[in-house]
Design a protein with these regions (language model features):
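A short N-terminal beta-strand-loop micro-motif at the entrance of redox/enzyme domains
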Residues: 9-15
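Short strand-turn-strand beta-turns centered on an Asx-Gly dipeptide
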Residues: 6-9, 53-54
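Short structural boundary motif marking the start of a folded domain
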Residues: 1-4
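Residues that cap or flank secondary-structure elements
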Residues: 11, 133, 143, 186, ...
Length: 389
């Protein structure tokens, strides 16, 4: 064990512990923007700097380890001034129009800036923008990127896809698709990990609310019968945004909220998930009868992100995938076929919406093969949990 002092409070931590982790163990708040434990510990944001007795310069706490007898100060005037300057520098290259930002109220940069209370004085802004294909389910806004490198590291070390990389040099350094490629050429699996770990709104899912909720959207114009399906994950996650208890945020209340929004019919995708299991199970048993005719093992095809990953990284194993559709697309096909017949409605006159936790679903619904009626997509629009709430 190593004995240290943090803000004059003596504590003991294991040898090799970073200063940041030691501070967190002692319940001392040290803000961070770029830090991800064991994934991104590069000290790029310089917001986690602390003062160490006997050392003139401030040090980053995320990638420096504790030493015996070290005395650390996390909130000295010198530290606070340095953090304010670093945040001001970051904001000088950041699009600060927060009211319309999808991450407003849930933005790490916004929180750190508010906590530091540095007033109105900022540096002259120099914001850069890059063109991006807005029809792609993953959207990158260069004007909001703070160069924390989280997306690069999470894609490299967790997903192993290496979609992102550092681009340009010097003061022009930024993050972009690796090898100068267009995102559509980068074999992105649309797993959403880079969006989840981005501390700001530089990365987000494509916003598809307009055709559903806008003044000219289907819920307001009532031009078609509107049907919505909800994924099991959304059923349990939607209440977090409203800080509702698990008991209060029941599936019945969710269905009621959707009906109040204007949807004519509400379905639970759990039903289609059961159909997927039955379909894949039956296919597996059929393959077992003729082992020599199939490539093994057999993989599920229920996740479009997984299917995209396999097709791009292991094309020789595509035949291992089940031929079954995902639950979303099975439910969409049921709505446009069986259900349309039950309510005596033309499939063309049904607007099918899916609320899912994954942006890969947005790409899946647009595949040309996902048209079981020949009248258009089985699922017209996919909304993620954030868009729904």
């Amino acid at each position: 064990m190593v004995n240290i002092k943090i803000n004059d409070v003596p504590i003991s931590v294991e040898e090799g512990t970073t200063i940041l982790e030691a501070c967190r163990e002692a319940k001392m708040i040290v803000p961070t923007l770029c830090y991800l434990k064991d994934i991104n510990e590069i000290g790029a944001c310089r917001v986690c700097v602390v003062e160490i007795k006997g050392i003139e310069r401030l040090v980053t706490s995320c990638n420096n380890t504790v030493k015996e007898g070290m005395e650390i100060y996390t909130n000295s005037p010198k530290v606070r001034d340095a953090r304010r300057i670093n945040i001001k520098l970051i904001l000088s290259q950041h699009n600060c129009f927060c009211p319309t930002c999808v991450r407003s109220g849930n933005c790490q940069l916004q929180k750190v800036a508010n906590d530091l209370e540095f007033g109105s004085g900022t540096f002259k802004q120099h914001i850069t923008e890059e063109k991006w294909p807005m029809d792609f389910p993953l959207i990158r806004d260069e004007s909001k990127c703070i160069k924390c490198m989280r997306c690069i590291q999470i894609c490299d070390k967790v997903q192993s896809l290496k979609v992102w990389d550092i681009a340009k040099t010097g003061s022009r350094t930024t993050v972009n698709v690796s090898l100068g490629r267009n995102i559509k050429e980068a074999d992105c699996a649309l797993c959403g990990q880079c969006i989840t770990h981005c501390p700001v709104a530089a990365l987000s899912g494509r916003d598809d609310k307009r055709p559903v909720f806008s003044q000219n959207g289907m819920l307001n114009t009532r031009r078609k019968t509107t049907v919505v399906q909800v994924a099991p994950a959304v059923r349990t996650a939607w209440a977090e945004a409203f800080k509702l208890s698990r008991k209060f945020a029941s599936p019945e209340r969710l269905a009621g909220a959707l009906r109040l929004m204007g949807f004519d019919y509400v379905f639970d995708t759990t039903y289609a998930a059961d159909l997927t299991i039955m379909e894949e199970g039956s296919e597996f048993l059929e393959r077992l009868k003729h082992k020599e005719d199939y490539q093994w093992p057999m993989f599920t095809s229920c996740c479009p992100g997984w299917v995209r990953f396999l097709k791009s990284q292991y094309p020789d194993m595509v035949d291992c995938l089940s031929t079954a559709k995902s639950p979303q697309q099975m439910q969409g096909a049921i709505i446009k076929n069986y259900f349309a017949d039950k309510i005596h409605e033309d499939p063309e006159n049904i607007f099918s919406v899916s609320i899912m936790p994954c942006i890969a679903k947005k790409a899946e619904c647009a595949l040309p093969t996902m048209d079981s009626t020949g009248t258009g997509p089985d699922v017209d629009v996919v909304l993620n949990t954030r868009e729904f709430v």
